[in-house]
Amino acid sequence: SQNNIFNFFKKMLTKSRNIFVIKISIIILNSLNLEYNIELLEIIKILALCSEFTLLGVLFIKTLKNIDINKEIYELAKKVYTWGKMACIFYLEANSNEIKDWILNESTEENILYNFVAITYSDKADIRKRLKKISFKKNEFSKISFLIYSLLFLDAEKGIMFLDYKEELLINYLERAKIWLKQN
């Protein structure tokens, strides 16, 4: 029965020492199309703190019903690093200024991965809109500059050349850079 399957794989999450058994357990539990279960969610969130399981944890969270999925992913993203953070940000909806600011701030913290995440971070931090502003918060322009650099550094098919609005982005960046240099 589905209940037996659920109980078996839930037990495997906490008892197994084999990474692949744990991953398979998360995937199978995810496929059961479960209602919100706080005990299981807490187990998955603990496992997701390890970057080995973060992506599967996020995918599990995304299928749950009756919870604020974006809030759960955002809270997890603030606790993980490198690959785990990248997985969270990829699935995180940047639907508030708080989240957009956080993504912008995190973009330079994860600089070992900038080749992979520059477009995602730039989009979700909304640097296109930010570059239309007159003034910036402390360090905001430096972080935007890092993302612009990262976009320029990437291969043409992955970086700024991929963006439909690259000219607008670069023109706005150069205009803001002139103003920023005069002020600092």
Feature locations, PLM:
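Flexible loop/turn segments at the boundaries of HEAT repeats in alpha-solenoid HEAT proteins
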Residues: L32-N37, I67-I73, E98-L104, Y114-N115, ...
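Alpha-solenoid helical-repeat scaffolds
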Residues: S1-N37, I43-A48
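Alpha-solenoid HEAT/Armadillo-like helical repeat scaffolds in large eukaryotic proteins
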Residues: F8-S16, L40-C50, F60, K71-V80, ...
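Residues within HEAT/ARM-like alpha-solenoid scaffolds
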Residues: S16-I24, A48, E52, K79-W83, ...
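Long internal repeat-built scaffold domains in very large eukaryotic proteins
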Residues: S1-Q2, S122-N184
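Structural detector for internal amphipathic alpha-helices that build alpha-solenoid repeat scaffolds
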Residues: S1, F20-L34, T54-K65, K85-N95, ...
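Eukaryotic acidic, Ser/Thr-rich intrinsically disordered low-complexity regions
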Residues: A94-K132
